[in-house]
Amino acid sequence: MSAFPGLPRVLAGGIILVDPGSGAVQRTIAFQYNPDTMTRTLKTESIGPESGDRLEATRLKGAPVETIKLDAELDATDQLEYPDQNPEVVQYGLHPQLAMLEMITYPSSTSVQDNIDLAAIGTIEIIPMEAPLALFAWGATRIVPVRVTDLSITEEAFDPRLNPIRAKVGLTMQVLNVNDLGVGTWGTSLFMAYHQRKEQLAGLGPATPLAALGITRIL
């Protein structure tokens, strides 16, 4: 799984966990090997026919609901070739890397314990626990707030201690837009930058004349 010498260095994609209020970086999780493919699905947020107004047919309620799916591979083979330089890999295999990804879907144990303590003293309303805001980073033009909606882990090989040493991780993420994050938040500012970059990139696309479609006019 080592890179061939002489090849240009490829940027790593990954997930950045930040404080949702200030944007301060709490943790960066880079993919060991970038996925070969990534599937993005956009579901339009239109007004819909239920409004009864035909003029609403071309109106949008907001940005589409964008879902990103990818599979990432983890492999400890290279590190295990140099055990003295990678003692944690020898002892735990891929457990630390997998745990970092899994913790995106967990609240902190401290928050859980605080709610348990509040429930024990009869607190009626317990506030849902706030997690760090996850950002999906895939190059300079795609840094976007997301919610990890599904995480699947397939452990494919193990060492003698049954630590996983090769695994495949399936990630499904929903892009969080203005409707999800609210007006005036740090995450909304980041999404708007993502939205505006899309507009800029769309403006760089080639202008195609009607003749290319075999027509001279629409009506």
What positions do the PLM features span?
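Acidic, Ser/Thr- and Gly-enriched intrinsically disordered low-complexity segments
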Residues: 1-219
